[in-house]
From Swiss-Prot:
GO molecular function (one): aspartic-type endopeptidase activity
Chief location bin: secreted
Tissue: Chorionic epithelium (trophectoderm) and placental cotyledons.
Organism superkingdom: Eukaryota
Glycosylation sites: N4
Family: Belongs to the peptidase A1 family.
Enzyme class: hydrolase
UniProt organism field: Bison bonasus (European bison)
CC annotations in GO: extracellular region
Name of the protein in question: Pregnancy-associated glycoprotein 60H
Length: 20
């Protein structure tokens, strides 16, 4: 999900927290 970072940066961060 690299393109998601540009479309939804905030969402990407939340996904990262869930991944951790």
């Amino acid at each position: 999900r690299g393109s998601n970072l540009t479309t939804h940066p905030l969402r990407n961060i939340k996904d990262l927290v869930v991944y951790m």
